[in-house]
């Protein structure tokens, strides 16, 4: 509801100085997801694109150092998350957030609250691979890769390099690549909290709820029930998105 969008945000970097390291990682990747989803959203525009791209570049430059204790970078990240928020408050989001919203508490009875920022970090590379089957979205992801200086000649190469970069960033922040390996305090684990049989049992309902999430409407590629289930499986097993 745009009626509750704030007119003013007080961005005080002192508030971020005592953040626990894991919170720095999760909120940072949440901000990266906000910016990337805003840039490829069907509601993107000339006013949101610069905010999204600049936020992405700041996060690329500053998040890992902020995670490792650099307070100047922590201050910069505080600004980056605000810019990303300004972008998505106007351009909206996509199915990374739809999936994160619906999986967050879905396995709480197994002690597995999937923290929102960690969920976004795990799902973002998979959703990029899914959305990039849409040519308009692929071009937008290529723009992001170019702005980040990742290289690549073809659009396919640029998308692959963007996905690889985000996965390396997750490694640097000690965020797992998939739900199966989502362990204590969201750290990677050989066997995570969510049993495979429980995930598969709840998958159809989670997928249906994700499709109905408000963020799905502005995603560049609209998933079917079957596609959403397959995509969530890729996020559980860390398998390739080839559909």
Residues covered by each model-derived region:
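Short glycine/threonine-rich catalytic loop with a Thr-x-Gly-x-Asp
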Residues: 24-29, 48-52, 112-115
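Glycine-rich phosphate/diphosphate-binding loops and the adjacent beta-loop-alpha structural elements
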Residues: 38-90, 94, 104-109
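Gly/Pro-rich interdomain helix-loop hinge
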Residues: 106-198, 241
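Short, amphipathic C-terminal "tail helix"
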Residues: 193-243
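Short alpha-helical scaffolding segments that buttress acidic/His motifs in well-ordered protein cores
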Residues: 32-36, 77-85, 99, 124, ...
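A glycine/threonine-rich phosphate-anchoring loop and its flanking beta-alpha core
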Residues: 1-44, 139-143
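Conserved phosphate/anionic-ligand binding catalytic regions in large, soluble enzymes, centered on
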Residues: 89-101, 112-122
């Amino acid at each position: 509801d745009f009626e509750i969008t704030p007119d003013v945000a007080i961005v005080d970097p002192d508030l971020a100085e005592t953040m626990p390291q894991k919170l720095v990682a999760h909120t940072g990747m949440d901000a990266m997801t906000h910016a990337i989803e805003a840039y490829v959203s069907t509601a993107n525009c000339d006013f949101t694109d610069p905010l999204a791209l600049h936020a992405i570049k700041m996060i690329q430059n500053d998040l890992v150092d902020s995670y490792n204790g650099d307070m100047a970078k922590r201050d910069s990240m505080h600004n980056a998350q605000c810019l990303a928020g300004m972008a998505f408050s106007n351009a909206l989001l996509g199915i990374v957030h739809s999936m994160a919203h619906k999986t967050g508490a879905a396995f709480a009875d197994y002690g597995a609250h999937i923290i929102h920022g960690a969920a976004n970090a795990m799902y973002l590379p998979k959703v990029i691979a899914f959305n990039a089957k849409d040519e308009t979205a692929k071009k937008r992801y290529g723009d992001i890769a170019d702005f980040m200086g990742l290289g690549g000649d073809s659009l396919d190469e640029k998308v692959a390099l963007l996905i690889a970069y985000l996965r390396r960033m997750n490694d640097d922040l000690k965020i797992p690549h998939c739900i199966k390996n989502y362990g204590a305090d969201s750290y990677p684990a050989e066997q995570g909290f969510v049993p495979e049989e429980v995930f598969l049992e709840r998958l159809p309902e989670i997928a249906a709820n994700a499709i109905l999430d408000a963020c799905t409407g502005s995603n560049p590629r609209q998933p079917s029930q079957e596609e959403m289930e397959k995509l969530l499986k890729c996020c559980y097993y860390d398998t390739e998105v080839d559909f």
